[in-house]
């Protein structure tokens, strides 16, 4: 374990929307340091949402999607006297955002649309409308936490 807490690095806001969450999303989307490709995919998806989304802008739908997918509870394994319990714990805000971004990207990659831009746009629209695989993942996490409510007193 490290001696001190790692300093939180400052993330610069993205150049088009001036939004730090979009920068984090682009960084998570990136493979092998190819940031320009990830940026093209992200902005392409937001433009595609602008065309499909009706009266709402792409950036608003993106923000709604992130908010809808953020989990408030999750379960962590805790070993007590030879038995392992799934203990429900609250999720810190930074981790909520990180999990939401991670889930949206991973489920967008598994979709069947042709290009990654289309996959990401469709997943963001689904997430904003409280449906889709990433929303189901959040619901499943809640169900796990609810089912293991009895072990909440093992929190640390």
From Swiss-Prot:
GO molecular function: rRNA binding; structural constituent of ribosome; tRNA binding
Name of the protein in question: Small ribosomal subunit protein uS7
Gene3D superfamilies referenced in this protein's UniProt entry, alphabetically: Ribosomal protein S7 domain (1.10.455.10)
Superkingdom to which the source organism belongs: Bacteria
Gene: rpsG
Signal peptide start and end residues: none
PANTHER family hit by this protein: RIBOSOMAL PROTEIN S7
Coiled-coil region list: none
Subunit structure: Part of the 30S ribosomal subunit. Contacts proteins S9 and S11.
């Amino acid at each position: 374990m490290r001696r001190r807490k790692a300093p939180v690095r400052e993330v610069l806001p993205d150049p088009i929307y001036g939004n730090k969450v979009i920068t984090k999303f682009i960084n998570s989307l990136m493979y092998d340091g190819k940031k320009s490709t990830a940026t093209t995919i992200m902005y392409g998806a937001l433009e595609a949402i602008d065309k499909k989304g009706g009266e709402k802008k792409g950036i608003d739908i993106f923000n709604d999607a992130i908010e809808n997918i953020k989990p408030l509870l999750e379960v962590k394994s805790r070993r007590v006297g030879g038995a392992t319990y799934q203990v429900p714990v609250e999720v810190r805000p930074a981790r909520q955002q990180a999990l939401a971004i991670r889930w949206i990207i991973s489920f967008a990659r598994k979709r069947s649309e042709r290009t990654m831009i289309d996959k990401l746009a469709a997943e963001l629209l689904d997430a904003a409308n409280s449906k889709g695989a990433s929303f189901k993942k959040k619901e499943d996490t809640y169900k796990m936490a609810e089912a293991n409510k009895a072990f909440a007193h093992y929190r640390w």
